[in-house]
């Protein structure tokens, strides 16, 4: 990877918002192959979401280029609360919850980065040992309150108020960078655009305590916005999680495959490891054959495989194809639950029932007359089979372990009927 210019690659991918010292960083990369860089994440939940992928993709690119990524889990800072991007005070979590979240996040990070040339550390290990007098004497005196007040993350909160606890967060994050630089030879911090002030505070602290010539760099990532101006990272159903129990591989795949033509190339550059020429070719396809959605399919494949592996991708594609073709009978019971989790649902008993009665009783049809008309016109499918016989009996035990009957009306209108009793 000696001839690979990672900074130019990051620029091409639209991954750099600000850098503290590009010339110094280039000089360091030219002379050293041991660059270590980090980003932090506080254990505010028990799963990562796709917003976390934004900094993690930068770390992963550096890892693939032979450098050493480090992730700091904020067991210490997480008990305080980062004010960045918030207009109100965070609700503090219990120590038990924080530790549970730390374990869950660690497992997900190892899945993304492996264990080779990658480290996870917890800032509880150094912040938790520091007493108040040490904090004030060794670090507090190096921070000017007027400078801290001018940081955007604090200034934006002054009108509505900010606690001393959250006000001090930037000092704790600066200490993180200093400790990592001093004890773990970490030279660079990356973060979102709103972390610029915290990152530069850490670099200033390193230079004050270790000397101005100590290598310390910072890089921030642009705010990821969709073409419609809204913030990237949410679906209509809320956050898109990396935990397959919270967001199934199928739902995850669907999030990416449904991206707008105006956004898909930007996301291919940022969230995949495809080469420039591959992405350029897909960009041409978007212009000439947008209806094929080849770029979206490739995006969904690459990101789903990265997060959920080949098995997760295969499951997502199997479910997607079954719903698209209408051939749902080969899905497993679990796959049906995943595929139709957000579809309209109804309940019915376990006994066999005439199709027309079944459709009316489950409120899929408003009347028997309408039900007969739709059946006769071939608009009704039971477990993937088109039924045009109004005397047909629905047997709930016939498929999906007797748990479900899938009714499709027309091309795409699915209802998942849960069988009770």
UniProtKB/Swiss-Prot annotation:
Known catalysed reaction(s)?
Answer: tRNA(Tyr) + L-tyrosine + ATP = L-tyrosyl-tRNA(Tyr) + AMP + diphosphate + H(+)
Key words, A-Z: Aminoacyl-tRNA synthetase, ATP-binding, Cytoplasm, Ligase, Nucleotide-binding, Protein biosynthesis, RNA-binding
Q: Which InterPro entries match?
A: aa-tRNA-synth_I_CS (IPR001412), aa-tRNA-synth_Ic (IPR002305), Rossmann-like_a/b/a_fold (IPR014729), S4_RNA-bd_sf (IPR036986), SYY-like_C (IPR054608), Tyr-tRNA-ligase (IPR002307), Tyr-tRNA-ligase_bac-type (IPR024088), Tyr-tRNA-ligase_bac_1 (IPR024107)
| Cellular component aspect of the GO annotation | cytosol
Q: Where does ATP bind?
A: 234
Report the residue ranges where the short sequence motif 'KMSKS' region is annotated in this entry.
231-235
The EC designation for this entry is 6.1.1.1
Chief subcellular location equals: cytoplasm
The protein's location, in the record's own words, is: Cytoplasm
Does the UniProt entry include the keyword Aminoacyl-tRNA synthetase? yes
Q: Which residues are noted in the entry as L-tyrosine-binding?
A: 38, 169, 173
MF-aspect GO terms: ATP binding; RNA binding; tyrosine-tRNA ligase activity
Outline the extent of the S4 RNA-binding domain.
353-419
In the record, the note on similarity to other proteins reads: Belongs to the class-I aminoacyl-tRNA synthetase family. TyrS type 1 subfamily.
The subunit field of the Swiss-Prot or TrEMBL record says: Homodimer.
Q: What is this protein called?
A: Tyrosine--tRNA ligase
């Amino acid at each position: 990877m000696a001839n690979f210019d990672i900074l130019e690659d990051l620029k091409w991918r639209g991954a750099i918002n600000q850098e503290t010292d590009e010339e110094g960083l280039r000089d360091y990369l030219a002379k050293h192959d041991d660059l270590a860089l980090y980003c932090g994440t506080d254990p505010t939940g028990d799963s990562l979401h796709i917003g976390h992928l934004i900094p993690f993709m930068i770390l992963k690119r550096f890892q693939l280029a032979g450098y050493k990524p480090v992730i700091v889990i904020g067991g210490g800072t997480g008990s305080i609360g980062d004010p960045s991007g918030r207009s109100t005070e965070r609700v503090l979590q219990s120590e038990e919850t924080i530790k549970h979240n730390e374990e869950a996040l660690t497992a997900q990070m190892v899945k993304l980065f492996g264990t080779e040339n990658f480290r996870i550390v917890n800032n509880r290990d150094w912040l938790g040992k520091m007493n108040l007098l040490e904090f004030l004497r060794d670090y507090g005196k190096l921070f000017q309150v007027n400078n801290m007040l001018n940081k955007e993350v604090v200034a934006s909160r002054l009108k509505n108020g900010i606690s001393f606890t959250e006000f001090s967060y930037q000092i704790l994050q600066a200490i993180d960078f200093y400790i990592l630089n001093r004890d773990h030879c970490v030279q660079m911090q990356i973060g979102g655009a709103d972390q610029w002030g915290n990152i530069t505070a850490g670099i200033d602290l390193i230079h004050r305590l270790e000397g101005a010539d100590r290598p310390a760099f910072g890089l921030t990532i642009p705010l990821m916005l969709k073409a419609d101006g809204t913030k990237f990272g949410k679906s209509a159903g809320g956050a898109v999680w990396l935990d397959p129990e919270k967001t199934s591989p199928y739902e995850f795949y669907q999030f990416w495959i449904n991206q707008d033509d105006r956004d898909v190339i930007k996301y291919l550059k940022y969230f995949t490891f495809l080469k420039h020429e591959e992405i350029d070719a897909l960009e041409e396809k978007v212009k000439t054959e947008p209806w094929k959605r080849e770029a979206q399919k490739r995006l969904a494949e690459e990101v789903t495989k990265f997060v959920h592996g080949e098995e997760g991708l295969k499951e997502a594609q199997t479910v997607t194809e079954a719903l698209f073709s209408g051939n749902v009978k080969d899905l497993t019971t679990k796959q049906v639950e995943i595929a139709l989790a957000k579809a309209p649902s109804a309940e019915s008993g376990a006994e066999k029932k005439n199709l027309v009665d079944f459709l009316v009783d489950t409120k899929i049809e408003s009347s028997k007359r309408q039900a007969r008309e739709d059946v006769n016109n071939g608009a009704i499918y039971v477990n993937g089979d088109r039924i045009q016989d109004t005397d047909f009996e629905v047997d709930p035990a016939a498929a999906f372990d007797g748990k479900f009957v899938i009714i499709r009306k027309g091309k795409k209108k699915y209802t998942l009927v849960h069988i009770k009793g």
